[in-house]
Amino acid sequence: MGRMHAPGKGISQSALPYRRSVPTWLKLTADDVKEQIFKLGKKGLTPSQIGVMLRDSHGVAQVRFVTGKKILRIMKAMGLAPDLPEDLYYLIKKAVAMGKHLERNRKDKDSKFRLILVESRIHRLARYYKTKSVLPPNWKYESSTASALVA
């Protein structure tokens, strides 16, 4: 998929392994992986951070191949899912940081322009999540109250 506010086509991506079976050297069972997800989710880690942690320290390349479910679905079943989707959360966090920067540096025209681009991404993503019923239909992003969402 192409980029929204850049000329790049976004072709590079990581390749999933061809074999979808669990490697023979992996000693963790599906229940062990779910238990690790529960522990890491309790600490407040996001699904992508949990995936990186499981990959790097436990050797689980793809949680979905081991458990049959994605990390976020497992977290939802355990009641640990975040109220905001992860990509939207990080975009809002970026917009809040840019807003703080603009309060200190009023004449930074480029940052002001980039903030507009980030906020338009937030609005587009929010519209998508409203159609998918992930966000309530009356949810609205406002830059004045955004810092409370990511705090």
From Swiss-Prot:
GO MF terms here are: small ribosomal subunit rRNA binding; structural constituent of ribosome
Q: Which GO terms describe its cellular component?
A: cytosolic small ribosomal subunit; nucleolus
Annotated PROSITE patterns: RIBOSOMAL_S15
| One BP annotation, GO | translation
| One Pfam family recorded for the sequence | Ribosomal_S15
Which controlled-vocabulary keywords does the entry list? Ribonucleoprotein, Ribosomal protein
Q: Which InterPro entries did the record assign?
A: Ribosomal_uS15, Ribosomal_uS15_arc_euk, Ribosomal_uS15_N, uS15_NS1_RNA-bd_sf
- Please give the NCBIfam families that the UniProt record associates with this protein: PRK08561.1 (NF006331)
* Family as reported in the entry's similarity comment: Belongs to the universal ribosomal protein uS15 family.
| Name recorded for this polypeptide | Small ribosomal subunit protein uS15
Q: Which organism is it from?
A: Plutella xylostella (Diamondback moth)
